[in-house]
């Protein structure tokens, strides 16, 4: 289902807000995460405006990560505050993305995103501890084996879900779609090499450790099984046999 949603910029504010609600973000006056509707609205607006010049890290990417977060939350049976936090973190995990590889310090991009979100979170009256909690979640999306990220992933179930949501499209979508996303990322980040090789390398990297959450592993296994069933159907059809 997620693969049918276009990966494009712009993704309108209205569509992005609707995807957040679909993923399970509560709609009362103050979400169970502690954010007011005003705060959530400002975060959605900022996310929808993200990176008009970026080929990959734009609002379309945010939409797909939010959808993945919703599916993972459902699989993990998350409700209330935890689900709201996961969806909000997925929405804002790449705010103010540079649109290129950063040569700056480790976690630079994640801290930039956390800083942009913190201004809104605290500025609309939420507890500073909530901003710190969101920052910890965002650090989990850095593709590094640094000891800080390893410790966060080991101790924080929501961080494991967010890290999986961030890469879920690349490891679970049909190969042609995943390859298209890789082309966008290659152009944006100016990564040398062919898209096929980059995707293969990334899949091998993920394959060494697997996804971080039980929910992610279950959904990935289901996606792989569905793709295999489709391939089997095509193979049977090619022999001229009836497919039930």
Language-model features: where?
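An active-site-proximal "capping" alpha-helix that borders the catalytic cofactor pocket
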Residues: 65-68, 108-124
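Alpha-helix N-cap and coil->helix boundary residues
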Residues: 81-82, 108, 129-133
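His-Asp-centered metal-binding catalytic motifs of divalent-metal-dependent phosphohydrolases/nucleases
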Residues: 65, 83-102, 113, 135-144
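Eukaryote-skewed repeat-based solenoidal scaffolds used as protein-protein interaction platforms
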Residues: 25, 29-34, 135-139
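Short amphipathic alpha-helical interaction patches enriched in hydrophobic/aromatic residues
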Residues: 24-27, 48-51, 73, 96-100, ...
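Inter-helical turn/loop segments and adjacent helix faces that build the functional surface
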Residues: 76, 102, 120-130
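Active-site flanking loop/helix segments enriched in acidic
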Residues: 38-67, 96-102
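Divalent metal-dependent phosphate-bond-processing catalytic cores, especially two-metal-ion Mg2+/Mn2+ enzymes
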Residues: 1-25, 55-63, 67-82, 92, ...
């Amino acid at each position: 289902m997620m693969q049918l949603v276009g990966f494009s910029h712009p993704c309108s504010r209205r569509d992005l807000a609707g995807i957040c609600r679909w993923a399970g973000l509560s709609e009362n006056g103050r979400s169970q995460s502690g954010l007011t509707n005003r705060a959530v609205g400002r975060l959605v607006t900022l996310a929808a405006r993200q990176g008009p010049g970026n080929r990959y890290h734009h609002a379309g990417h945010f939409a797909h990560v939010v959808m993945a977060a919703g599916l993972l939350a459902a699989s993990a049976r998350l409700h209330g505050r935890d689900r709201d936090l996961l969806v909000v973190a997925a929405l804002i995990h790449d705010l103010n993305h540079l649109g290129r590889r950063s040569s700056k310090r480790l976690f630079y991009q994640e801290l930039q995103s956390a800083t942009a979100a913190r201004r809104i979170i605290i500025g609309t009256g939420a507890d500073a501890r909530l901003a710190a909690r969101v920052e910890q979640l965002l650090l989990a999306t850095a593709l590094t084996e640094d000891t800080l990220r390893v410790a966060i992933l080991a101790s924080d179930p929501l961080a494991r879900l967010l890290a999986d949501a961030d890469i879920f499209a690349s490891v679970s979508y049909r190969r042609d779609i995943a390859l298209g996303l890789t082309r966008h990322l290659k152009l944006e980040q100016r990564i040398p090499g062919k898209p096929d090789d980059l995707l293969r390398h990334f899949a091998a990297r993920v394959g060494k450790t697997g996804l971080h959450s039980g929910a992610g592993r279950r959904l990935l296994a289901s996606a792989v099984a569905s793709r295999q069933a489709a391939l089997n159907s095509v193979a049977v059809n090619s022999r001229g046999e009836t497919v039930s």
